[in-house]
Amino acid sequence: YAVAADAPAAAALAGNLYEFSLTHGYDAVSGGLHDEVTACGDVYRDDRRLWPQTEALKAHVARLQDAGDDAARSRLEVGIESLFRYHLMGPPGGWREHINSDGENFYGSYPASTLYHLASAVGELERISDVR
């Protein structure tokens, strides 16, 4: 949005939120994004839903492409690997929607909205595939 609308204030805010999430939102072991952190940066829920992982991938793409953040490339690779290792496994055509801090699935259903998030992330990754 910030680039399309030529809105530097939005770009600055997005950059601050991105940096906050990098500092406080990630599980160092899995490379996945925690469900919730407080405004002070403390982990409130260390479970991990699938859809925020896809949103994180899209944020890394935006940082790489629009903010010139070359370090976002390695974050993107870690995020993709974490997504496949912890969420895109199990029965063919299925996924692990919500996992605990040990990486165990505890959510039994497969929300259809997850397909939207996966497709959006894949679309962004495909769009920049020539950048990689």
Label every PLM stretch briefly.
Residues Y1-R132:
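Glycan-recognition and catalytic cores of secretory/periplasmic carbohydrate-active enzymes
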